[in-house]
């Protein structure tokens, strides 16, 4: 059996494009079980405030622990964590703390993500992402051995102003 687990961001739920289409692709690749996490967090002032971001991470991590507590991880032959924004830190921490042998897709990771040393990961980030210093995150990804696809002028949803480049 193959399991895909989606770790959303705070304002980016699992039915938004990056996570929605990624899990559809995972299903096409044979992932026959899916878990979609949901978070409740309503505080403002996270951007640019490491202490507030860490508090949010701690809250979301606790919620993820609760939602994933009944999973029998050894029954799965293959586990894929799809994560977005602060969810990338939650997924990295969860895999590390529980020794989950998984692959990870990290959409728009934060600096905090690489402090948690995600393993078997591939990351995607835009240079115009207001939540991340793209070049600092790129350096952290490199130091962690995580391949990073960096998209010029893409925002926190990996969108650009121009969809057509000629």
Map each language-model feature to its residues:
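Serine-hydrolase catalytic machinery in alpha/beta-hydrolase-like enzymes
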Residues: 2-75
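Catalytic histidine neighborhood in serine/cysteine hydrolases
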Residues: 33-35, 143-159
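Gly/Ala-rich beta-loop-alpha elbow adjacent to hydrolase catalytic centers
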Residues: 82-91
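A conserved short beta-strand
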Residues: 100-109
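Acidic catalytic loop of the alpha/beta-hydrolase fold
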Residues: 128-132
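Conserved small/polar residues in nucleotide/adenosyl-binding loops
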Residues: 164-166
């Amino acid at each position: 059996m193959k399991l895909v687990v989606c770790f959303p961001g705070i304002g980016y739920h699992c039915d938004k494009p990056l996570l929605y289409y990624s899990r559809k692709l995972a299903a096409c690749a044979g992932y026959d079980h899916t878990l979609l996490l949901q978070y409740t967090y309503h505080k403002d002032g996270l951007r640019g405030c490491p202490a507030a971001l860490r508090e949010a991470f701690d809250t979301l991590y606790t919620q993820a622990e609760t939602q994933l507590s009944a999973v029998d991880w050894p029954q799965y032959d293959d586990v894929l964590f799809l994560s977005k924004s602060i969810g990338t830190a939650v997924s990295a921490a969860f895999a590390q703390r529980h020794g989950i042998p998984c692959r990870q897709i990290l959409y728009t990771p934060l600096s905090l993500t690489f402090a948690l040393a995600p393993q078997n990961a591939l990351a995607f980030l835009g240079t115009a992402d207001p939540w991340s210093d793209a070049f600092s995150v790129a350096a952290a990804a490199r130091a962690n051995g995580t391949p990073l696809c960096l998209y010029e002028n893409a925002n926190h949803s990996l969108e650009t102003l121009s969809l057509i480049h000629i």
